[in-house]
């Protein structure tokens, strides 16, 4: 599994692809669906639809990466999130323009949505301090209490279409920072 997320910005040939296990994979199934600018009716892109087999492969890849990722020290796990945040900020204007053309949002709304998404990445970067396990002696007579936080495994999110610059960032950075794969 690669931890260099800079390659996320490297595919620009117009082919619908999914990002799995550190690689861009061409979708073998359905050719995807047109993305239409609601203001003009013009087709501006295509989005891929993965086959069931491709989804199963993505889940298997995430499952394979999980043991190593959960064992990665938390300070190391958040490093890709710093890179991700920097990329989001670097490309914020382009991403906002994409939201405007794909969803008919105003520029102000699109920029605000992205800012709120970036704020979630910032919060996830701060997760190590919140992950400290607690221990309470004598919570009740002869009872000590200990909280243990452990990664759970593979996470996925099916998010609504209306806030694509924000809602996925309610899930992905927190899952990754806490040692889960996504």
Q: Each PLM stretch: what is its role?
A:
Residues 18, 25, 100, 122, ...:
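Short glycine- and Lys/Arg-enriched binding-loop motifs that mark or flank ligand-binding interfaces
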Residues 34-35, 52-55, 165:
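A short local loop/turn or secondary-structure capping micro-motif enriched for an aromatic residue
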Residues 134-182:
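Conserved small-residue-rich beta-alpha loop and adjacent elements
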Residues 1-39:
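Hydrophobic face of amphipathic alpha-helices that form TPR/SEL1-like repeat modules
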Residues 27, 109, 164-167:
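Secondary-structure boundary/capping motif
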Residues 42-131, 142:
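Glycine-rich loop-to-alpha-helix module at the N-terminal edge of alpha/beta enzyme cores
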């Amino acid at each position: 599994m690669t931890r260099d997320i800079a390659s996320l910005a490297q595919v620009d040939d117009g082919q619908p692809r999914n990002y799995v296990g550190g690689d861009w994979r061409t979708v073998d199934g359905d050719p995807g669906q047109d993305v239409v600018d609601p203001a003009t009716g013009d087709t501006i892109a295509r989005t891929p639809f993965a086959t069931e087999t491709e989804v199963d492969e993505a889940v298997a890849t995430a499952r394979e990466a999980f043991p190593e990722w959960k064992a990665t020290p938390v300070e190391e796990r958040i490093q890709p999130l710093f890179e991700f945040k920097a990329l989001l900020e670097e490309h914020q204007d382009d991403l906002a323009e994409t939201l405007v053309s794909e969803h008919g949002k105003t520029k102000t709304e699109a920029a605000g949505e992205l800012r709120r998404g970036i704020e979630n990445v910032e919060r996830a970067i701060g997760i190590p301090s919140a992950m400290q396990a607690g221990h309470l002696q004598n919570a009740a007579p002869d009872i000590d209490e200990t909280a243990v936080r452990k990664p759970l495994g593979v996470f996925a999110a099916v998010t609504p279409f209306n806030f694509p610059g924000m809602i996925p960032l309610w899930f992905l950075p927190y899952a990754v920072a806490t040692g889960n794969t996504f």
